[in-house]
Amino acid sequence: MFSLRPTALVSLSVVLFSIQETLSEQQPFVSPGWSDQWWHKSELESYTFPWPIQKVAIIGAGPSGLAAYHELDKAGYDVYLFERDTVPGGNWHYTDETPVKEPIPNADVSIGDFVPSLPPEGVRLPYEEHYEGNVSDELLRAHRGPKPIWNSLQTNAPPPLQQFRDHPWPADQPWLLPHAVLGKYIRAFASFNGINSNDVENPHISYNTRVELVEKCFTSTENGPMRTGWTLTLKQVSRTGTNTSKAVWTKENFDAVVVATGRFNAPYIPNILGLKAWADRFPDRIVHSRQFRRPQLYTNQTVLVVGAAASGVEIATDIAPNARAVYLSIRPRRISNSNSAGNPLSSRWMGRLPHNVSVVPEIKRFLPPTSAIALSSVELTNGTILTGIESIIFATGFRYTFPFLPQFHNTSLTNHDLEHKPKPIVTDGTHLRNLFLDILSIEEPTLGFMCMNIEIQNFKYAEYIAVALSKIWGNKATIPPVTRLWELNERRVMEKGGYGKYFQFLGFRGEREMIRLFTGWLNDAAASHGGRQVR
């Protein structure tokens, strides 16, 4: 998702290297695990939805949410879009404002992004509350959730790989784009579809609106309550004056729900021995990478960056010209020429690090803090003691979390637990479980998910998922019955060696295999049930 600092020569070499590394057939291939051509089975074995699907809610207006809206709207569904931020764009909406400071140690993954805010029990909806002063400002910030990108961020893939098919870039675009340019492109696509934040005439879009809860909806019948979809509890927060705001809670029912909230919402900071004492003693000097905005904040400092995936390498490189020195702490297995599941810090990457960036081993522990952070010590796994550290940035990634779906969280399970009822989607936050093709809840097939895989081109991949959901819910493409879905899921888990951090990893080859699967399945369905072909 992210690229290196905006120096033309370095950036071009990084993109060329990135593409070469991505396309390299030397890189081990991790199968997506969905190799069975289940769509060739008889229609008698297909899943039947218990209610017709017409009204669909989409949670999130990033690229994948917009792609879902575009496709479902085109297919004739009544589509409603809910976005907690002020404008569309997802992670590509940059602001100088930073997210609310993350706790150390991590919050429980079920509330890793936010703690759902529900109206008082028993009140009539819509229900309002009013705020002023600092309370108002903090409410607005926490509600919209500023995104984890920084001022100098650029894309790490050429425009043709980061575009909506119906909205191509001009041919003369440079290979690397500043985040502001991509943000404008996404907003232009939203405007073209009448779903930008200023399209006030569209009653189906709601910005500044966070989905607090998604729960089963029941309708009273002669035979008792009958399940008919989903009820969403919504909270819209808006500014009413210079330092005042109000929150309005409502509820609305839908036949199906698309989760398009992305993967970069709940920060992960490893629970290293002694870290909490440092965080308590020096709270402003220890942050997650999502707080990083500008390198000037670290001028003449000695900075410890933890993590060797994309953000860690890029932030270390970005702050190096301003900093006195930078330590980049990595795990030994990250120094390799190939890695099937992530962004390796290969010898070629290391050769591009500035002279004042030193690569050091993993942190073993933080020794008891003293009166000043620079006088305190960090012990590495090889026994080295670092002192003089003035700031620490944890570029250690994010965890999957859906606070609005508490019924699908179970943090008590281990990575290798397979049997549990109800079947959770989120456990420890490193991966997702019990999703067919990683896009559809097996237990609740009216609950869809957009672009939850690792190492994919979101713009392109989102369009295939959107078409799949549209056809499945419109009975123009079939899926197996639930018993068969569970069989396929269990076989996939075994093929991938159990659950773990890279369970959702695809990469170039895995994404290509999944696109072949989507294309074969959906075009086979189009031949049987009608509808357009995908390519």
Curated annotation (Swiss-Prot):
Upregulation = Expression is highly induced during artificial growth in symbiosis with Populus, which is close to its natural condition.
Pathway in which the depicted protein is active: Secondary metabolite biosynthesis
Give the E.C. number(s): 1.8.-.-
Region forming the signal peptide: 1-24
Against InterPro entries, the record matches this protein to: FAD/NAD-bd_sf, Flavin_mOase-like, FMO-like
Which amino acids does the record list as binding NADP(+)? 307-312
- Can you tell me which family this protein belongs to? Belongs to the FMO family.
What enzyme category does the UniProt record give? oxidoreductase
Residues the record marks as carrying a glycan: 134, 243, 300, 356, 382, 410
Q: Per its database record, what is this protein's job?
A: Flavin-containing monooxygenase; part of the gene cluster that mediates the biosynthesis of the psychoactive metabolites ibotenic acid and muscimol. The first committed step is glutamate hydroxylation by the 2-oxoglutarate-dependent dioxygenase iboH, and the last step is decarboxylation of ibotenic acid to muscimol by the decarboxylase iboD. The order of the intermediate reactions is somewhat ambiguous. IboA likely activates the carboxylic acid at position 5 to introduce an amide bond, and the flavin monooxygenase iboF generates the N-O bond. There are several options for the latter step.
The entry marks the following residues as binding FAD, namely 60-65
Q: Which of UniProt's keywords are assigned here? A: FAD, Flavoprotein, Glycoprotein, Monooxygenase, NADP, Oxidoreductase, Signal
Which GO molecular function, any one, fits this protein according to its record? flavin adenine dinucleotide binding
Please list the cofactors this protein needs: FAD
* Family annotation (Pfam families): FMO-like, NAD_binding_8
**UniProt name for this protein:** Flavin-containing monooxygenase iboF
Keyword set includes Lyase: no
